[in-house]
Swiss-Prot record:
It comes from the Bacteria. May be the site-specific invertase required for pilin gene inversion. Moraxella can express either a Q or I pilin; the inversion of 2 kb of DNA determines which pilin is expressed. Keywords: DNA invertase, DNA recombination, DNA-binding, Fimbrium biogenesis. The gene is piv. Pfam families: DEDD_Tnp_IS110, Transposase_20. It comes from Moraxella lacunata. This is Pilin gene-inverting protein.
Amino acid sequence: MSKTYIGIDIAKNTFDACFITHNTWQNCTFTNNQQGFIELTLWIQAHHYNTSTLHLIIEATGAYWEKLAHWAISHHHKVSIVNPLYIHAYAKSLGIRTKTDKQDAILLARYGAKENPPLWQPKSDNEIKLTALLKQREHHKRQLIKERTRQEALSIYVKSYTDDNIRHWSDSITQLDHQIWQLINCTPELNYRASLLATIPGIGKKTLPHLLVVIGDGSSFQSAKHLASYAGLAPRHHQSGISIHKQSSIGFSGQKELRSALFMPAVIVSFGRYPAFQKFVKRMEQKGKTKKQIIIAIMRKLLTISYAVIRQNRPFDKRIHE
């Protein structure tokens, strides 16, 4: 039985849905709430489509897609969550410059039919809770940095007034760290994945929770390259003939918090403290890579190794990942 791909371009209050059949498309706009989700199903049924064959291709726009995705899963629909960068690249490959909500929904449906992206698996309740705790920790960390920066700019006579705020945010972060690890240790699947990730040189207690919430069981990513692209660590090359040859870079999109968490482990690895990565660092140096490029390459390598140990269900092995 063939699938029906439905592209969904979603915003805060509305979403556009489109499915393609016989080289024509049907398009409609719905409200991004429970009533809109019900109307989406009625609209599909009105076109005589079997809902069991539906495959929703939803663009990952902020957190606006989450309610619809969870609703679709609860109604036994197949769902894929697609990085907006992939759709942008796909549109570029087709020579499409127009950008409207309707056009994006059509593109998503076409992309789904062509690529058949991996199915999205909703996080468990404890994974959702872990994600929320990490977001809260990041917020408190930003507040702490802000207070410390503000204190540096204050007169020596009033600096003491910010001490209470600094202590408050510091204590709050300590409490959140305790809650994060208590949750990981008390959740069998999280604890097991954490034990695998902990075997990777350089991956410590601050980085590990971020890897857990992004990678999950790994099934949401087609490959390690897919994960690296999602995290904003995939290299971008700028070369054309002999006249354009820019230094490769990464796209600073995707998971900013994960990149921040991987940065310090990568810096430590770049100093040659871990024998398992010494050959890799040496190869980068021999290729004439800058210190920054080496650190980014190590961040990407740590991420791809993390994906491998979870997908292969076995701890880090120097012989394989060297």
